[in-house]
A protein has these predicted regions:
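Alpha-helix-loop-beta-strand connector modules within alpha/beta enzyme cores
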Residues: 14-17, 65-93, 115, 133-144
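Catalytic cores of alpha/beta
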Residues: 39-42, 99-111
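Active-site-proximal loop/short-helix segments
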Residues: 54, 58, 115, 122-133
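Hydrophobic faces of well-ordered beta-strands that scaffold small-molecule active sites
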Residues: 30-36, 51-53, 91-95, 120-122
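Active-site glycine- and acidic-residue-rich loops that bind
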Residues: 31-34, 98-104, 138-144
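Short, small-residue-enriched loops and turns at beta-alpha junctions
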Residues: 40, 68-70, 97-101, 127-128
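N-terminal glycine-rich anion-binding loops that anchor highly charged ligand groups
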Residues: 41-60
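N-terminal amphipathic alpha-helix/helix-capping segment at the start of soluble metabolic enzymes
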Residues: 2-33, 41-46
């Protein structure tokens, strides 16, 4: 586990910049999955450099259900903003399927950015999606 990145002036780097550095580094980057702000703080206290949050953990934490597009974009971005407020660590967050078409994906990126999320990942399933480890999934055509 590496120490927090600093700019040339000694100031802490933006979380987005820090995540890019961590990903580009030759060392293996371990991102513990967190389900709430406390988990993010515990990961920070344990010395991790970044955290990740997935849709299954979010849906199970908030609703006690599997990840099947039951949480809205605003519910997830609000939840992730709490993680980001609780820790200096960069957060790589699940953006589900982007919550619809290309316009929705662009909106998701903007809301996640406002929430303080350093990076996001998007599934290739059609919307609404099915839980990733359950049968009956359909993926978006490559042309789309």
């Amino acid at each position: 586990m590496r120490t927090e990145g600093r700019s040339r002036g000694g100031f802490p780097l933006r979380k987005t910049t820090r995540l890019k550095q961590l990903i580009a580094a030759p060392e293996i980057l371990v991102l513990p999955g967190v389900h709430d702000a406390l988990g993010a703080r515990l990961a920070e206290a344990a010395g991790f450099d970044a955290v990740t949050a997935g849709g299954y953990g979010a849906t199970a934490t908030l609703l006690g259900r599997p990840d099947s597009s039951q949480l809205s974009l605003t519910e997830l971005s609000d939840m992730y903003s709490r993680f980001c407020d609780a820790t200096a660590l960069p957060l790589l967050a699940d953006a589900d399927t982007g919550f619809g078409n290309v316009t929705n994906v662009a909106r998701a990126v903007r809301l996640y950015e406002k929430a303080g999320v350093a990076g996001l990942f998007i599934e290739d399933q059609v919307f609404p999606k099915r839980c990733g480890h359950m049968a009956g999934k359909a993926v978006v055509p490559p042309a789309e």
